[in-house]
Each structure stands twice: as structure tokens, then as C-alpha cells.
Amino acid sequence: MTGDLARMSEMPGPDAFLRAVPLTSGIAGFAAPPAPIGVVYAIAGSSSRVLLDRASIGALCDDPDSVVAAAGQVGSQVKMRVGTTWLVANVRSLKLEDNAGTCIAAEIDFLGEGDEEPLTGNLDRFRRGVTRYPMPGCEVFPITTADLQQVYAAEDRANITIGTVYPTTDIPAALYVDPMLGKHFALVGSTGTGKSTAAALILHRICELAPQGHVVMIDPHGEYAAAFASNGALYDVSNLQMPYWLMNFEEHCEVFLTSSGSARQFDADILAKCLLAAKAKSRLGQEIAKLTVDAPVPYLLSDLTTIINAEMGKMDRAGDTAPYLRLKTKIDEIKADPRYGFMFSGMLVADTMASFLARIFRLPGDGKPISIIDVSGVPSDITAVVVAVLARMTFDFAIWSRNEPQRPILLVCEEAHRYIPAGQEATSAVGRILGRIAKEGRKYGVSLGLITQRPSDLAEGVLS
């Protein structure tokens, strides 16, 4: 019994495990954890600074783990231990800190945190956000492939895989679809960096995940037709057949008015009066008790020019007819120009809004949930109006059907800076409607995707 008591007194106390050497250091098959490569120098909520030892980083270049070997590079990640938690941060910039060249200062942005796995010391159960920041002087470590797998692990939520996480070859790069579309998204980059390829891949994956979804892509250069030949409906000037009467009054003004300054307002008043009279002559217009100039009511362009002529005949002085002549001349030019036939053909007056929306929004989808609207053949002076009508129809359709089962729609605009340039988003119809979708679209199930090579030229309010 005395021997048993003696042996019991030799058993480790509760603190012995804390003082013990990590189990992995004595078990074959477990790699020793990487040594620290620097220390935390300054901490701030938005951006922090660490000092990296150049020699320590150089010693990792030949590490068999490609993630560890890339430690310290711009775009790589580092980690810091706070209690039993690992904090993970992105390296944003680097510069030499001393004349000897032994110390590198790095600006970092925190990604999130995860628990420290007791056996291996690796990162576990990563989550976005930081609850406790490290103190200056805290050691900085390189992350490993196992850590990176935790950072980019896809949870049990709808996601699409678009590639692998660099510098690994086996960690899938996944995007959560609902957060991406619910908050809108933008693809930005200089010419030749692969924006169009990335956009095509993302849209393909979304269509595979949700084949009954609805995607409308505005394609200004005819780049996407080949990419979606099998699962997309392709529309260009030969088959778009967008009825001109779908335009609201603001869009009519952008197409028909050629004047500026005070004369433009006078011309707009004349157009409003004549346009309302032309819509009132149609059968549908006669059935509407309170017809407005914005109502999408079919009307004949010939009726509009006839009414303009009649109003012009009431003028006493020849000089007073100039605004009417400007309007009539512009309308006649558009009617006679075959380039505008996709929108201003007299045959389109018989179309209905329901049939046009069903075609563009793929209702039903018939295995082709995406519509590619190729506007490369559209005359440049009305391209913005065509995009404005499509965007407004998308938003209005979502509002009109909000009491029905929701049909989420994704509207993607390539070369977005052409339609919503910085400082001018409030002066054009397309700028206003895309801005409204960016601010309010998610309430009604409309998502907006913007692709641009000039983010600085894009309206700041929309991009934010």
C-alpha cells in the first residue's frame, strides 16, 4: 500500500500538461512547428505593422511546404498567437526598416482567427473577425498548408469552386454564392488580367449550381457568346427586338432630344405633350384612366410625328417651329436608319411587355438560365439608353413580382465605367437606375455585378 501511495505521489499534477513538450515533437510523421519570423510592432484597427527578420524568411525558401516557403511575400499570410487563439493576417506591403537590411517592415490586414489545435499547434475552426488583438512584441509565425486549408475551408453553405488557392495546388478556392449576390460584387483589374475569363467562370458555376436562376449579362464587345453557346440565350441587334415604347420619358428625352441648356427643357415639354397624346391614341392607352407619359404603352412613331406636325401648324411665327422641327427630324432619322431597327421597327408595336420580359429573363429557362445581351452592334449614341431600359426592366420586374414566389435575378455589366462614370451617375438614366439597384436591389432579389478596368472612373457611390 505504501508503494502504491508513493507511486501516486509521483503522478503529474494538473499543470504538468501545460509545461509538457508538444506531443508532435516526439511522434514521427508530425512536422515541427515553424519558428517565428518576426514580431508585432504596431497594432491598429484598420491596419497593423509587423517587423520580419530577413534571415528567418530566407531560411524558409526551401521548405517543402509551398505555403511556408512563400512566407513574408506580399499577398501571403502570417499568424500570431493570442492565448489559445491564432490570428491570421494578410501581408499588404513590405519595406526595409534598417540600413543593414536585416529587418523588413510589413503592413498587415487581419483576416480572422481560429483555435489552436492542441496536438499539432495548427489553426483549427477558422472564423472571420478578430476578438482579441495581439500586443506589440507578440511573435509572428508563417502559416502552413494545413492552416490555409482551415482559412479557405467551405462550410456547409451553397458555394462554387473557381480554382485553387495560390501557392497550393489542392486547396479549392470557393465563393459563397448567397453573400456574394446578396451584397453585389465587382471584378476590377487592368486590361489583360483575366476579368472576362473570371466572370465567365463564375457565371458558369452559378448556372450549374442554380440552373433555374436568371442571369442577364450586358456584353459591350461580343466576348461572351462563345463561352455560353450551350447554356445561354444570345441576343444582339439581329434578334433583340426591344420595343421602343418600353422607354420611360427620361429615356425618350435622351434619344430624341438634341438641344441643350434652356432649349432642352422647352423641347422636353413639347415631347411630353406629344408623347402623351400618341399613347392616348392606342387601344391600351384608351383603357387606362390616368395615363402618364412614363407608362409602357405601345404607340406608333407615325402617330407621334403626326401630332408634332399638328402642333407645329398651330404656331404663328416660323421661329416658334424650330423645337418641333428638331424633334421631328430626329425621329425621322431614327426611323430611316436600319441600325436602329432592333428597337424602333414598326413591327415591335405589336409586342407585349410580358413576352419581352419572358425572353430576356428566361421564363422558363429551358436549360439556358443566362441571357447574353451583345450591344456591340448598337449605335453608340443609344447604347446607354438600351442598358438603362434593360436595368430598369430588371428592377421593375422584381418590384412588381415581390408578392409572388421570388425569382432572383443577377444583372452583370461589363465595362461598367461606361454607364456610371464618376461624378455623372445622377445625370443619366442608366446611372440613376444602376445606382438604385446597387442601393436597393437586394431588398427585391436583384443582384448587381460590375466588371471594369477603370475602378477610379466608376461612380464611387455605386462601387461602395
Tell what function each PLM region has.
Residues 1-188, 404-407, 422:
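Basic- and hydrophobic-enriched, low-structure N-terminal and domain-boundary segments
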Residues 159-242, 458-460:
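Glycine-rich phosphate-binding loop of nucleotide-binding enzymes
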Residues 178-180, 206-211, 363-365, 400-405, ...:
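Conserved catalytic network of the ASCE P-loop NTPase/AAA+ motor domain
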Residues 185, 373, 449:
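Conserved beta-strand position immediately N-terminal to the Walker
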Residues 212-215, 367-370, 406-410, 443-449:
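Loop/turn-to-beta-strand initiation segments
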Residues 222-228, 232-233, 244-436:
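P-loop NTPase motor domains
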Residues 258, 429, 436-440, 444-464:
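Conserved ATP-driven motor cores of ASCE-family P-loop NTPases powering translocation/secretion/packaging/pilus
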